[in-house]
């Protein structure tokens, strides 16, 4: 049976393998194709596509866009939208996601200040040295940094005590509405998918409302299986 993975991250965001290494891993486990869907960036796609072509694997250009959803009973819920088969050279698309990254960078600067004030020395330079200059830094990177420095014992502890929603180091940042992310993906020729709904911890009725809302704006699919490694 030929298998495809439609939700994969590289070191361009919070993955552990470089784009080329992901291709090698995909070939090792027998994947026919995989989608590179890094957070708010397409920086790894060219490298992955080149390696995939040599390996005889289909590389699906993608992205995972972080959004913020509000409804009658839900306020500022972070929702992720995966885009598949996007034109990752589309200039308007690239301009939009660059703005999303700028908002994330502003959040990161505030987070670094909060950690230093709490007696956990950290700097942007140290983060870049550890994870790379071109990496989109996410809360997962801060969790790994905290583990490496001995501030916490695990990534889970970092989120449970400090980085998770409602915790001392959680900073709400500006994000687009999920419907805008769906539209943006479609404008770039892609297919929009609601990522990992099981992680949002909302009621079945609210999830149904979310899906109906996004479908009106062009949502094509819902992620039904998510594997973390």
Regions found by a protein language model. Name each.
Residues 1-3, 12, 16-29, 33:
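N-terminal glycine-/serine-/threonine-rich phosphate-binding loop
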């Amino acid at each position: 049976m030929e298998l495809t993975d439609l939700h994969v991250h590289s070191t361009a965001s919070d993955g552990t393998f470089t784009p080329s290494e992901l291709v090698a891993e995909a070939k090792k486990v027998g994947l026919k194709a995989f989608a590179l869907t890094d957070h708010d960036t397409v920086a790894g796609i060219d490298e992955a596509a080149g390696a995939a072509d040599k390996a005889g694997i289909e590389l699906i250009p993608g992205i995972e866009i972080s959004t913020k959803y509000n409804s009658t009973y839900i306020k500022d819920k972070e929702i992720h939208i995966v885009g598949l088969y996007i034109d990752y050279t589309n200039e308007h698309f690239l301009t939009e996601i660059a703005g999303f990254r700028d908002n994330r960078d502003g959040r990161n600067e505030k987070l670094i200040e909060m950690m230093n004030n709490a007696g956990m020395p950290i700097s942007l330079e140290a983060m870049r040295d550890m994870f790379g200059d071109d990496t989109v830094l996410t809360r997962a990177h801060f969790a790994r940094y905290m583990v490496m420095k001995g501030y916490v014992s695990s990534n889970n502890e970092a989120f449970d005590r400090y980085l998770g929603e409602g915790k001392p180091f959680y900073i709400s940042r500006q994000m687009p509405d999920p419907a805008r992310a769906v539209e943006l993906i479609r404008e770039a020729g892609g297919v929009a998918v609601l990522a990992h709904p099981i992680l949002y911890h909302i009621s079945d009725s609210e999830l149904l409302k979310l899906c109906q809302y996004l479908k009106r704006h062009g949502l094509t699919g819902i992620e039904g299986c998510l594997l973390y490694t």
